[in-house]
C-alpha cells in the first residue's frame, strides 16, 4: 500500500473525500514525466502523485463527465459490500448519466 497525494478539488479527491488515497500498487510501468506539460496543455489533469518518487498515479480529463485512470489497483481493496471510492463514484456517474 502506498500513499498517493491527491490534488485539491480534483474528482478523485472528492471521491475519496481526502487529500490522499491509500491503495495497493504494482509498478511495472510508469508515466514518463517529460510528457506531462504537453498533456496538461491539452486538458489532462495529473491529480494523484506518489510524491516520494514523483510518480503519476492518477489522471483525469475534467472536461468529460467521468474519466479517471489510476496506476494503483482499487480492485485489490474493494469488497462486495465495501467498494472503493473510485468504483462507487464510477457506478454513481453511470446511474446519473442514464437518468
UniProtKB/Swiss-Prot annotation:
Allosterically activated by GTP, when glutamine is the substrate; GTP has no effect on the reaction when ammonia is the substrate. The allosteric effector GTP functions by stabilizing the protein conformation that binds the tetrahedral intermediate(s) formed during glutamine hydrolysis. Inhibited by the product CTP, via allosteric rather than competitive inhibition. Residues 1-99 form the Glutamine amidotransferase type-1 domain. PANTHER family: CTP SYNTHASE, CTP SYNTHASE-RELATED. Pathway: Pyrimidine metabolism; CTP biosynthesis via de novo pathway; CTP from UDP: step 2/2. The active site is at residues 73, 75. CTPSs have evolved a hybrid strategy for distinguishing between UTP and CTP. The overlapping regions of the product feedback inhibitory and substrate sites recognize a common feature in both compounds, the triphosphate moiety. To differentiate isosteric substrate and product pyrimidine rings, an additional pocket far from the expected kinase/ligase catalytic site, specifically recognizes the cytosine and ribose portions of the product inhibitor. This is CTP synthase. One of its GO terms (biological process) is pyrimidine nucleobase biosynthetic process. L-glutamine binds at residue 28. One of its GO terms (molecular function) is CTP synthase activity. One of its GO terms (cellular component) is cytosol. Pfam families: GATase. It catalyses: UTP + L-glutamine + ATP + H2O = CTP + L-glutamate + ADP + phosphate + 2 H(+); L-glutamine + H2O = L-glutamate + NH4(+); UTP + NH4(+) + ATP = CTP + ADP + phosphate + 2 H(+). Its EC number is 6.3.4.2. Catalyzes the ATP-dependent amination of UTP to CTP with either L-glutamine or ammonia as the source of nitrogen. Regulates intracellular CTP levels through interactions with the four ribonucleotide triphosphates. The keyword Transmembrane does not apply. Keywords: ATP-binding, Glutamine amidotransferase, Ligase, Magnesium, Metal-binding, Nucleotide-binding, Pyrimidine biosynthesis. It comes from the Bacteria. It comes from Mycoplasma capricolum subsp. capripneumoniae. Homotetramer.
Amino acid at each position: 500500500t502506498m500513499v498517493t497525494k491527491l490534488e485539491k478539488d480534483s474528482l478523485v479527491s472528492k471521491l475519496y473525500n481526502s487529500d490522499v488515497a491509500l491503495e495497493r500498487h504494482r509498478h511495472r510501468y510508469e508515466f514518463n514525466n517529460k510528457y506531462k506539460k504537453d498533456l496538461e496543455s491539452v486538458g489532462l489533469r495529473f491529480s494523484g502523485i506518489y510524491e516520494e518518487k514523483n510518480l503519476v498515479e492518477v489522471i483525469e480529463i475534467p472536461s468529460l463527465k467521468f474519466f479517471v485512470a489510476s496506476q494503483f489497483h482499487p480492485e485489490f481493496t474493494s469488497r462486495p459490500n465495501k467498494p472503493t471510492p473510485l468504483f462507487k463514484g464510477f457506478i454513481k456517474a453511470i446511474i446519473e448519466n442514464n437518468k
